Amino acid sequence: MCLVWGKMRILIVESDPDLGQLWQRHMQRQDMETRLEAGQSGAICALQTQYFDIVVLDLVLKQGSAMAVADFASYRHPDTQIIFVTNTSFFSDGSIFALNANTRAFLQSDTPPEDLTAMVAHYTRAV
């Protein structure tokens, strides 16, 4: 958990490198330790070797399945929280919360990065 390392540890899984780097920079400015991965294989590898307080996860990955990443994160690290982001209206009915018990938020990809960072900080403190 964040108390062990002293910094919040965030895994960002986003297929769009520009968007992922934008989020990463905002979180780093808030003294969060971040790792950016573009797809399922990189995210799974990261989760096998490190603990993360939060996973910010693009629901529609170009490489692999976001649900597989979320399931693995929940299995490997039951305290890890998931924030899904998407640029689609898929799951806009809120059903995403029933599919993964660690899901804490579901946001549009165009959410201002400072708002996403504030949500990450909020849910990390809640752990």
Where are each of the predicted segments found?
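Short acidic active-site motifs
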Residues: 39-43, 65, 115
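Non-catalytic signal-transmission and effector/linker regions of two-component phosphorelay proteins
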Residues: 1-15, 26, 99, 108-127
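Two-component/phosphorelay signaling modules centered on CheY-like receiver
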Residues: 17-35
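Short, glycine/charged-rich "phosphate-handling" switch motifs in NTP-dependent
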Residues: 104
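Hydrophobic/aromatic residues positioned on beta-strands within the core alpha/beta folds
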Residues: 85-87
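Conserved phosphotransfer microenvironments
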Residues: 57-74, 89-93
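Acidic, metal-coordinating helix/loop segments flanking the phosphotransfer/catalytic sites
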Residues: 36-54, 58
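Conserved phosphotransfer cores of two-component systems
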Residues: 48-50, 73-80
